[in-house]
Amino acid sequence: MAVKVEYDLKRLRNIGIAAHIDAGKTTTTERILYYTGRIHKIGEVHEGAATMDFMEQERERGITITAAVTTCFWKDHRINIIDTPGHVDFTIEVERSMRVLDGAIVVFDSSQGVEPQSETVWRQAEKYKVPRIAFANKMDKTGADLWLVIRTMQERLGARPVVMQLPIGREDTFSGIIDVLRMKAYTYGNDLGTDIREIPIPEEYLDQAREYHEKLVEVAADFDENIMLKYLEGEEPTEEELVAAIRKGTIDLKITPVFLGSALKNKGVQLLLDAVVDYLPSPLDIPPIKGTTPEGEVVEIHPDPNGPLAALAFKIMADPYVGRLTFIRVYSGTLTSGSYVYNTTKGRKERVARLLRMHANHREEVEELKAGDLGAVVGLKETITGDTLVGEDAPRVILESIEVPEPVIDVAIEPKTKADQEKLSQALARLAEEDPTFRVSTHPETGQTIISGMGELHLEIIVDRLKREFKVDANVGKPQVAYRETITKPVDVEGKFIRQTGGRGQYGHVKIKVEPLPRGSGFEFVNAIVGGVIPKEYIPAVQKGIEEAMQSGPLIGFPVVDIKVTLYDGSYHEVDSSEMAFKIAGSMAIKEAVQKGDPVILEPIMRVEVTTPEEYMGDVIGDLNARRGQILGMEPRGNAQVIRAFVPLAEMFGYATDLRSKTQGRGSFVMFFDHYQEVPKQVQEKLIKGQ
């Protein structure tokens, strides 16, 4: 059992480890857990036994899919590590982990520098204002180059990297690390990296070490006037002053300290842990988060364990032993096991049965989780990702939720046997609850079950999990593009549903104004009824009728998005009006409005990055143009070229195979969803004809 750390917010670090798909992030996390004493044998990813990757698919594919939270201890500090996936299809996982962590380690492959997915992760960290340090990993690999990492961080990320360490030896002779802040060097006495030896800086590295120490002092002087004065007078600042200044610059998002090592060869990981303690923020170092009261007033929430409870649910997982786990971060107050909480997002009361602190695959039960801490709750039934929990009697605030990107790819799925039918719908519902970017719907015309997700890999993994975890066999159709429909001009319509045939009639009558909204706005409903021309209790029914009818647009039956509907007039009948009648009136009105509003089809546009040797560049660009791509730019990367483009998803199916044959297997690409846009006229006609 590791030492218990007395609760002290200053000594808490909530960090994520983020990276491009093969930069060695899971290995780095593994090593951190090994050195902090929570794992007794190191698991290698390429042997398929890493601790953080605890779903079977991850072990097979060697990629990390679900963000697990793991607690470990280092130098009297508690470190909660939120593991984040590096594959593009799982960006929601990265988004939601960024939302609840305070700092991050971004891992780069030293032989590759900054890769496309690292840029995505970096942009997400910028968006959530997460301070970060960088780890140049794989320093023992052929082609490893610290300066490539530094240069690409400046050029591609616009970062201000600060060299904190220099390597001793390079590639396969990489044998130690120079700490330029403390002017000390370290080498390793054994392969496990547990025997670190401090040595004097080798003669041949002294000049370089002094040069970078000097540069580091200059950077530190930007954040501390004392250092500035000492620097100008030729005095040497103390180690504590330098650490404090670099810490301040990092937390203020002005600089990114860069550390190096080889996680696989156990070098540099303990020094990286020291850096987490030295330079990444505690919950007290970051600005308080904002919440909204029911009256719409914005309030600040401070990390005070004695304050009112406020927590955010950031992940749901189905656990084979305890059922549903809700991962939360407590922002204020203290959550105790056995207590009741109020979910302000849903307006429901829930009971906290047990609280767990997680290791990657085992767990300890705890009595309470205090402000700043992360853990899992057993017993919550209604709470989903992005919901806010407050104390039963605490002020009702709602914390800003987590943005969920729209799924862009649809696949029809059907059970192989009658027996699988019932199990399939239950299993899909469970998976959709766990992963907000995965949706399940029924095709309005064909009645088929459609699953939608962020990419082909995402859906493959879902189907895989159906088979393994839920023992459901299913046949899957070909992936289809998730088109959307919208209008291009504002319209005014009315919907009247009146039936008077003996007995009780039906009467619902609404007038709505429908306007197009900018891309990505979704749906906005405004109730502008005054003087009770439609009674209050029927308004939700009108909205429901509209939303249901929007599930299937007039052109090709895809959902209608990006519109604002204002309900401004109508009438009702004392006896014959009902919720049903108003629901139908709403749905009739919106159908007519979309027909009249010059409807268009929208398609998902992907941001695509193709890396190809120079000699195939012409072919690759020609091919992207033929796929209706819009080339955004090119840049050399090593001896290859990187082409960036926007390309419609519809044109990207099977691209991997085509690219391989065009570049004789040397080209590679990544793509992620960027935005929806109108399809060209001739494409729209073709889609409508193909119905």
UniProtKB/Swiss-Prot annotation:
InterPro entries per UniProt: EFG_II, EFG_III, EFG_III/V, EFG_IV, EFG_V, EFG_V-like, EFTu-like_2, G_TR_CS
Location(s), subcellular: Cytoplasm
UniProt-recorded Gene Ontology molecular function terms: GDP binding; GTP binding; GTPase activity; magnesium ion binding; ribosome binding; translation elongation factor activity
Keywords: Cytoplasm, Elongation factor, GTP-binding, Nucleotide-binding, Protein biosynthesis
Entry GO terms, CC: cytoplasm
Key word Nucleotidyltransferase present: no
Origin superkingdom: Bacteria
GO process annotations (BP): ribosome disassembly; translational elongation
UniProt cross-references to Pfam families, sorted A to Z: EFG_C, EFG_III, EFG_IV, GTP_EFTU, GTP_EFTU_D2
Residues that, per the record, bind GTP: 19-26, 83-87, 137-140
Residue ranges of domain tr-type G in the record: 10-284
Family: Belongs to the TRAFAC class translation factor GTPase superfamily. Classic translation factor GTPase family. EF-G/EF-2 subfamily.
NCBIfam families attached to this UniProt entry: EF-G (TIGR00484), PRK12740.1-3 (NF009379), PRK12740.1-5 (NF009381), PRK13351.1-1 (NF009891), small_GTP (TIGR00231)
Biological role: Catalyzes the GTP-dependent ribosomal translocation step during translation elongation. During this step, the ribosome changes from the pre-translocational (PRE) to the post-translocational (POST) state as the newly formed A-site-bound peptidyl-tRNA and P-site-bound deacylated tRNA move to the P and E sites, respectively. Catalyzes the coordinated movement of the two tRNA molecules, the mRNA and conformational changes in the ribosome.
Name used for this protein in its record: Elongation factor G
